[in-house]
Amino acid sequence: MARISGVEIPNEKRVVISLTYIYGIGLSTSQKVLSKLNISEDVRTRDLTEEQIKAISTEISNFKVEGELRREVSLNIKRLMEIGCYRGLRHRKGLPVRGQSSKTNARTVKGPRKTVANKKK
């Protein structure tokens, strides 16, 4: 397995798909990187030469990926929470941030139901 940006990318998959295993690199970014380096998207990762792997690594080092990107995202969320804006309050309460209804759904964000016992008559 080739190691790029601290991530083991799978050998058996096409390079364009293998690069998406790196956090912060999606399909379009991996296509741009490969076209810039004149590497075919259909080549398997195991068939890449050392020079091609190094070229891909140096090209990807220009992007924010993995730990650096995760850190930036978490700092952005912390900043929203500190300034007390609406999005920050929603993050703090563990509710949907982007305007979704939360009366009935939103179970993914809210977590499992906290069941309340019925009043006896």
UniProtKB/Swiss-Prot annotation:
UniProt KW Ribosomal protein keyword: yes
Function: Located at the top of the head of the 30S subunit, it contacts several helices of the 16S rRNA. In the 70S ribosome it contacts the 23S rRNA (bridge B1a) and protein L5 of the 50S subunit (bridge B1b), connecting the 2 subunits; these bridges are implicated in subunit movement. Contacts the tRNAs in the A and P-sites.
Xref: PANTHER family: 30S RIBOSOMAL PROTEIN S13/40S RIBOSOMAL PROTEIN S18, SMALL RIBOSOMAL SUBUNIT PROTEIN US13M
GO molecular function: rRNA binding; structural constituent of ribosome; tRNA binding
Domain of life: Bacteria
Keyword terms: Ribonucleoprotein, Ribosomal protein, RNA-binding, rRNA-binding, tRNA-binding
Location of the region described as Disordered in the Swiss-Prot/TrEMBL record: 94-121
Gene designation: rpsM
A Gene Ontology BP annotation from the UniProt entry: translation
UniProt subunit comment: Part of the 30S ribosomal subunit. Forms a loose heterodimer with protein S19. Forms two bridges to the 50S subunit in the 70S ribosome.
UniProt-recorded name of the protein: Small ribosomal subunit protein uS13
Short name of one Pfam family: Ribosomal_S13
Skewed-composition ranges (Basic residues): 110-121
Similarity comment text for this entry: Belongs to the universal ribosomal protein uS13 family.
